[in-house]
């Protein structure tokens, strides 16, 4: 699964800068000397807030470690911009950031407006419901009814899949 599955956090933007960078960056970035990365920290283990020993939230996760590694490799300081998931896509489209790291899954629409790295994790998509409804809601056909509510994150591939496969359902994002 991708962070497309995760619930959206609040829409306030914030930036966190980490010190590293072992020299002058040789690549053009949004801000000289920095690698600016947008993320939506609501999709553990990729990006999320962990509470440190002092009780303070700190950005953590695989994508955050990878972003730091890339910044270090390039000799740049890392700046993380936190936004809602659909904000990551907007930040990329407006070229306000150098990278978006939020468990993004490539699809034709996204590939027409942005470049993707090689895939470093292969996930899948599935329907999720409470255990008591597992036998009742076990296919697209079973949930493609006007009295069934289907939820998916705004801007996600899952929202596209819900619209394509369950057009008669009450789809909310």
State the predicted function of each range:
Residues 1-34:
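Short, low-complexity disordered leader/linker segments with a strong preference
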Residues 24-103:
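Extracytoplasmic small-molecule ligand-binding "clamshell" domains
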Residues 24-35, 120-126, 142-146:
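Phosphate-binding glycine-rich loops and adjacent basic patches that engage nucleotide phosphates
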Residues 31, 74, 110, 121, ...:
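Short, structurally constrained coil/turn elements
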Residues 37, 41-44, 57-72, 104, ...:
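Bilobed "Venus flytrap"/periplasmic-binding protein-like clamshell domains
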Residues 45-50, 109-111, 161:
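A short acidic, helix-capping loop that chelates divalent metal ions and anchors anionic groups
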Residues 53-55, 117-118, 168:
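Glycine-rich, phosphate-binding/catalytic loops in enzymes
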Residues 77-142:
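Acidic, polar ligand-binding/catalytic clefts
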